[in-house]
Amino acid sequence: MAVLASAAAVLTIAGGAGAAAAPTTLTASLSGEAEPEGGQGSGTARLTLDPATGRVCFNIRLRGVGTTAAGHIHRGAEGVAGPVVIALYGEPTRRPRGCVQDQPAAAIRQILRRPGRFYVNVHTAAHPDGAARGQLER
């Protein structure tokens, strides 16, 4: 009986560890109003983060922004500017999407643990400090 209980405990722990490392999708509603000197842009960001592989994939849809220059995930509560945690892209594009590799697992786990403490920020030439921003959520 003790052997069965131990085996069940091992399976439960292993299953829980695997679930914690699974890719997770987060979203953000982006708005220029969330930036101190942002534009009139709005849109959505959908990110899939995988702490096991260090891969972060993103698909950002924007309206009223034009060509973007860069996109990042920053640490910071709503209305608070914070440091970049993960750089998503840094080349001009009208349709930001793709994946970045080799991101720190610890940073990804922090984002997944408390997504509301992080935000997606999209930059343009006209708004280098941020054209649109949105807090991450499940």
Predicted features along the sequence, with ranges:
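Metal-centered catalytic cores of metalloenzymes
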Residues: A2-G71, R75-R138
